[in-house]
From Swiss-Prot:
Cross-referenced Pfam families: CMI2B-like
Annotated region (Disordered), positions in chain: 62-84, 125-169
Tissues where this protein is expressed: Expressed in airway epithelial cells.
Listed name of the protein: Ciliary microtubule inner protein 2B
Keywords annotated in UniProt: Cell projection, Cilium, Cytoplasm, Cytoskeleton, Flagellum
Basic and acidic residues composition-biased segments: 71-84, 125-147
PANTHER family linked to this entry: CAT EYE SYNDROME CRITICAL REGION PROTEIN 6, PROTEIN FAM166B
GO cellular component: axonemal microtubule; motile cilium
Quaternary structure and partners: Microtubule inner protein component of sperm flagellar doublet microtubules.
Location in or out of the cell: Cytoplasm, Cytoskeleton, Cilium axoneme; Cytoplasm, Cytoskeleton, Flagellum axoneme
InterPro entries registered for this protein in UniProt: CMI2A-C-like_dom
Length: 275
């Protein structure tokens, strides 16, 4: 029975042998001939006469057991502090990843990174407090209850959060009535303004837009200047004019000036009748 315990797990101790196709090592197999693979491996595994094989003190292939990883208690896990590598010392041109920076617009690099890191740290601390086990929370609460409060402790003043008004609703004299450079939204009446910085242009456009849509604008409308015309309707064109003249194709028998004058003076319906 002691010899049978040394066989490889999975082999029959009564009749151990390998099946054809086994690619592992079988000792002394290369020196055995004249029998089938199963018979030869069976004799070698049981041990030839006068040779104790396999040795009693060890097995051919001991079972392999993966090492157990040490269990680390949840409370002793190290706190993740990867975001501390990002600080205010970053300069414009930094191409690394800054968490939550892709959701902030219309600010310079320093302001975007500072606000993104602040939001990420606040969110990370909030998630970490929610993941604490109830026992740890209970111990933390009891420790807080046991700590005596110092006398005369001043309460921290609460900062009132003032919502920033929209530039559309601001007064025209408000210096904040503009959009910052980098704003990609639509700004009414800013299409035909140029020659100044983006904040100045958006301020002028917002003022013009507010004047057009103010309640008193309908009573005192501003007349737009007449649109320029490509062709004069009361004069003809000079000879050698190489541009297109609508209706000239069907005119003949007069000079170029008379023909173009007649063609340009006709209405669209009259030109269709001539065609």
């Amino acid at each position: 029975m002691a010899v049978a315990s040394t066989f490889i797990p999975g082999l029959n101790p009564q009749n151990p042998h390998y099946i054809p196709g086994y690619t592992g090592h079988c000792p002394l197999l290369r020196f055995s001939v004249g029998q089938t693979y199963g018979q030869v491996t069976g004799q070698l595994l049981r041990g030839p006469p006068g040779l104790a094989w396999p040795p009693v003190h060890r097995t051919l292939l001991p079972p392999i057991r993966p090492p157990r990883s040490p269990e680390v208690p949840r409370e002793s896990l190290p706190v993740r502090r990867g975001q501390e590598r990002l600080s205010s010392s970053m300069i414009p041109g930094y191409t690394g990843f800054v968490p939550r920076a892709q959701f902030i617009f219309a600010k310079n690099c320093s302001q975007v990174w500072a606000e993104a890191l602040s939001d990420f740290t606040h969110l990370h601390e909030k998630q970490g407090s929610e993941e604490l086990p109830k026992e740890a929370k209970g111990r933390k609460d009891t420790e807080k209850d046991q700590v005596p409060e110092p006398e005369g402790q001043l309460e921290e003043p609460t900062l009132e959060v003032v919502e920033q008004a929209s530039p559309y609703s601001m007064d025209d004299r408000d210096p904040r009535k503009f959009f910052m450079s980098g704003f990609t939204g639509y700004v009414p009446c800013a299409r035909f303004l140029f020659g100044s910085s983006f904040p100045v242009l958006t301020n002028q456009a917002l003022q013009e837009f507010g004047q057009k849509h103010s309640p008193g604008s309908a009573q005192d409308p501003k007349h737009l200047p007449p649109l320029p015309r490509t062709y004069p309707q009361n004069l003809g064109l000079l000879p050698n004019y190489g541009g297109y003249v609508p209706g000239y194709k069907f005119q003949f028998g007069h000079t170029f000036g008379h023909l173009t004058h007649d063609a340009l003076g006709l209405s669209t319906f009259q030109k269709q009748l001539l065609a």
